[in-house]
Amino acid sequence: MLTLRAPAKINLFLLITGRNESGFHLLDSVFCFTHDLYDEIIIVPTSATENSVKFIGASQAIGADNSVSRVLRFVNDYAKRYFNVTLVKNLPVAAGIGGGSADAAALLRYFGGLHNISEVLLSQVALSVGFDTLACLYSHPCHVTGMGEKIVALPESKLVYPILLVCPNFPVSSAEVYKNFRERRSIFSAESNLAGDHQAFEDMLSLPNDLTDAAIEIAPVISDVLKSIKNCKGNKVTKLCGSGPTCIGVFDTVENLRDAHSELIRHHKWWVKIAHISL
């Protein structure tokens, strides 16, 4: 038996810079990953000729054709091996923090090492699972452009940043948010011009998330979450993470961060967590 960790994905900003010939949106974002907030994946090989996948603690129902099952089917074809997988969902489902992508990426990392699968093939499988999965496969601070396939690693400092994550118990489809963005906006953002250089944490956070209005239109509760975080003492930055509905809060002191955590838990039935990232 083996247990893997699949950390949450955090977008410090998310710019939509255009669309490609196939109509897919092009993004410009920096991804970071939480040190202390993750799904847990328990893997047990089986002599059976089929996989079993069990989810524990999922905030929403997860269909049979999910990111974990897709990776397992790839491993079945590649290595002719089957597994019983139990996934402890500490991250909310369809929440904009890459839970499904992170789960798939953690499995790909493990099976890639176990069966000496080439990096090129792993990358192809990751992109076939989801646009965030490739960045989650590396699970290191990175500048992501294109459809998620262009990744430049950022030098990770020893600085650790505490953040507040708040998710209303309301799943949001990334596809629906991008569709809504396409229907309501025709002007795209300029690229951030990071070019892989290390930038200050605050500078990156000052850049917007272009999906915010589109996400709020689908899930108005996001606006309530953003306002609630912003109204907490010592709040410096409040923004949507990914396509939502999870929102990020950054505070001037750890004490104010902890107070905000306690206050939001006391007044709302939301998923509220303190996590730490490096950049």
Swiss-Prot record:
Enzyme Commission code: 2.7.1.148
Active site, per annotation: 9, 132
Pfam families documented for this protein: GHMP_kinases_C, GHMP_kinases_N
Catalyzed chemical reaction(s): 4-CDP-2-C-methyl-D-erythritol + ATP = 4-CDP-2-C-methyl-D-erythritol 2-phosphate + ADP + H(+)
SUPFAM superfamilies, per the entry: GHMP Kinase, C-terminal domain, Ribosomal protein S5 domain 2-like
This protein's pathway: Isoprenoid biosynthesis; isopentenyl diphosphate biosynthesis via DXP pathway; isopentenyl diphosphate from 1-deoxy-D-xylulose 5-phosphate: step 3/6
Organism superkingdom: Bacteria
Keywords: ATP-binding, Isoprene biosynthesis, Kinase, Nucleotide-binding, Transferase
GO biological process, one term: terpenoid biosynthetic process
Residues that, per the record, bind ATP: 92-102
GO MF terms held by the record: 4-(cytidine 5'-diphospho)-2-C-methyl-D-erythritol kinase activity; ATP binding
PANTHER family noted in UniProt: 4-DIPHOSPHOCYTIDYL-2-C-METHYL-D-ERYTHRITOL KINASE, CHLOROPLASTIC
Family: Belongs to the GHMP kinase family. IspE subfamily.
Role of this protein: Catalyzes the phosphorylation of the position 2 hydroxy group of 4-diphosphocytidyl-2C-methyl-D-erythritol.
UniProt-recorded name of the protein: 4-diphosphocytidyl-2-C-methyl-D-erythritol kinase
